[in-house]
């Protein structure tokens, strides 16, 4: 979600913020947005919070839209969970099925697993290749407010975050 709570912590209790050793965020995008043409929803919802987090050198790992859109789940994969048997497998199959249903009702064959992809990257960072980047938060643009501008060339700006590159 938006980084509002983390930004509030940084401003109110910088002593505690300094104890954060891994901040994995499902948000932002190196390309087009999903809420506006430029902005991913979680970045758009509170771009000032993202700017605060970036300005305070927290160890940010951004799991962005482009990465999440590669992590797809199809109806048959959700049903395969059910074959494992048991209440937990049935619950997960039902949850995944409902989530996938959002995509299929919109004519898509599969659903991108946005938040689950970020959760997996946090719990098992060995499953994801992260690369260092420089991120700037667009705060002023009329059409670009909320855009995370991702720079992969270190000679243009210092790297201040990492972005999920491959799973």
Predicted features and spans:
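Active-site histidine-anchored catalytic micro-motif
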Residues: 2-75
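Conformational coupling and interaction surfaces
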Residues: 44-48, 63-167
